[in-house]
Regions:
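Active-site-adjacent substrate/metal-binding segments within catalytic domains
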Residues: 1-67, 76-98
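Short acidic, gly/pro-rich beta-turn/loop elements at beta-sheet edges
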Residues: 12, 109, 157
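Solvent-exposed loop/turn segments at secondary-structure junctions
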Residues: 40-42, 64-66, 103-107, 154-155
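Short Asp/Glu-rich motifs
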Residues: 45-47, 69-71, 157-159
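Active-site neighborhood of glycoside hydrolase catalytic domains
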Residues: 72, 76-85, 89-153
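Active-site loops of AMP-binding adenylate-forming
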Residues: 163
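Conserved small/polar residues in nucleotide/adenosyl-binding loops
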Residues: 170-173
Length: 173
């Protein structure tokens, strides 16, 4: 499989034909999974319809990536609304194989630095967002599809080399 990242930064240039061409290539390469990268956007329904029809499993990230967020009340409400809206829209697709909370945010704690001033508060905010808010909101719309908090993730147990799905830099220190 591979990550799907936006094929154009101008959304109006993305047509069903471009989506079909890209996914036809994935099928021709014998991919069986496409991961919707959390630094992009949620694709149009034609993307998921194609995956349903052609046997591609979708790993669906929520659109949180490569950052650390302070959990304000407004963000809390937005997270719940975004989760419910997208789960409600996508849950019926046979291709939907996995929900993932974010891209590389958990690993940011150990490898990117710069969080020392507020690290305890921000770490708790992270855990609240991806170990509590999203899974709870998701259950109300899709209680069947598996949820994983981050890619990579150790389930909130930062720095545990025996409990995460690793990327190359997670075990270098």
């Amino acid at each position: 499989g591979a990550d799907y990242i936006p094929e154009d930064c101008i959304y109006s240039k993305i047509t069903p034909e471009r989506i079909y061409e890209l996914l036809d290539t994935a099928v021709a390469c014998h991919f069986n999974c496409i991961r919707i990268w959390g630094g992009g956007y949620y694709p149009a329904d034609v993307f998921y319809d194609y995956c349903d029809e052609h046997g591609l499993i979708v790993w669906q990230d929520f659109m949180y990536a490569c950052n650390v967020y302070e959990l304000t009340e407004k963000l809390r409400e937005s997270i719940i609304e975004e989760t419910k809206d997208n789960a409600g829209r996508l849950r019926h697709h046979a291709s939907l194989g996995l929900w993932c909370g974010n891209n590389e945010m958990e690993s940011a704690w150990d490898h990117w630095g710069g969080f020392n001033d507020h690290s305890d508060t921000l770490k708790q905010d992270y855990l609240t967002m991806f170990e509590k808010l999203i899974p709870e909101a998701l259950k109300s719309e899709d209680d069947v599809t598996f949820y994983w908090p981050s890619s990579p993730s150790s389930g909130g147990n930062f720095k545990d080399p025996d409990s995460d799905d690793a990327v190359s830099y997670t075990h270098l220190t």
